[in-house]
Design a protein with these regions (language model features):
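Conserved glycine-rich acetyl-CoA-binding loop
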Residues: 88, 92-106, 120, 126-134, ...
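Residue-level detector of beta-propeller blades
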Residues: 67, 143-146
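C-terminal "cap" of GNAT-fold acetyltransferases
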Residues: 84, 119-122, 126-130, 138, ...
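Extreme N-terminal starter segment of soluble prokaryotic enzymes
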Residues: 1-2
């Protein structure tokens, strides 16, 4: 059974190991890191020192086979505790296709709504990242129709804004 626990600095080794290409890296973090590849120390430094770091909750998904995934939950607006945003969502690439991504996102939704009291959860996903988009929609998110363009390595990628509300449950 998949579970969530607080992220540990040592988890960065696993998270970074799942990022095999720059394309996957950019799907995962967009432009949050300037250079690829990054090290576990780079990830932990970002988590410790980025603006608003105290308002971000990092989680590791695990099961009987070990660490399976990673997800962050943050308050995008300090004045709105009813809305949280997911980010840095990634699954162990060797364990994809088993429903673990959807299970992890659903656990994070449950935590967000039942523990944090959020009424709305948002996430951005690149349209080009079709497996992630399918996962989020299957977990209960819906497309808001809002699209933001990113320039990634000379290509224009469309970031779709998705949301989940308690009414969607």
């Amino acid at each position: 059974m998949l579970r969530l626990r607080p992220y540990r600095r040592s988890d960065a080794v696993n998270v970074i190991s799942w990022i095999k290409t720059e394309r996957i890296f950019r799907f995962w973090c967009a432009d949050r890191f300037e250079n690829y590849p990054i090290t576990p120390d780079d990830l932990n430094d970002q988590y410790d020192n980025s603006e608003g770091a105290e308002d971000v909750f990092h989680f590791t998904a695990y099961d009987e086979q070990g660490i399976a995934g990673h997800i962050n939950i943050r308050f995008p607006d300090k004045n709105d505790i009813d809305t949280v945003r997911f980010g840095y969502v990634i699954l162990d690439d060797s364990r994809r296709g088993q429903g673990l991504g959807k299970a992890m996102v659903r656990l994070a939704l449950k935590y967000s709504t039942e523990i944090m009291g959020a009424e709305k959860v948002t996430i951005g996903v690149f349209a080009e990242n079709e497996p992630a988009l399918r996962c989020y929609l299957a977990a209960g998110f819906r497309d808001t129709g809002v699209v933001e363009e990113y320039s990634i390595n000379g290509e224009v990628w469309n970031c779709l804004e998705l949301e989940y509300t308690c009414q969607d449950a």
